[in-house]
Amino acid sequence: MRIALCSYSQKEKETALLMKLGKVDRFDNGVFCVYAMQRDGPYDAVVVMEDGARGMNFCMSIRGYSRDVPLLWISDQAEFEPQSRRMQVDDFWVKPVTEYQLREAVSQLLQKTTRRNEPREEDE
């Protein structure tokens, strides 16, 4: 599984945790994440760990590229939750988030990817 971690700051602990779930690419700019998806195909999950307007900009860049890539936004500002719904973010969490919560949230996103990629009965 391929996971993108989008954050301006280094997230060593979170990166190490996500690496247990798949290959992690870290981006400090939403545009670079989109460029990587254009070049290499969509990620199985994208995790935005940036607060407020910066996090919203990451999400807008990613949603501008694809409405289908599973997207988790973690922010310290709960008031951005309505914007996350409007942008069709799959899951929005307010910090602090424990390692267990992060692992579970990303695992659920990856399960959505698996279900989306499974052939439907009518396709067979």
Predicted segments — roles?
Residues I3-Y35:
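Two-component/phosphorelay signaling modules centered on CheY-like receiver
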Residues K11, G30-V34, R39-S66, Q77-A78:
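Conserved phosphotransfer microenvironments
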Residues V97-V106:
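C-terminal output helix
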Residues R63, P82-R86:
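Alpha4-beta5-alpha5 "output face"
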Residues S107-E121:
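The C-terminal output helix
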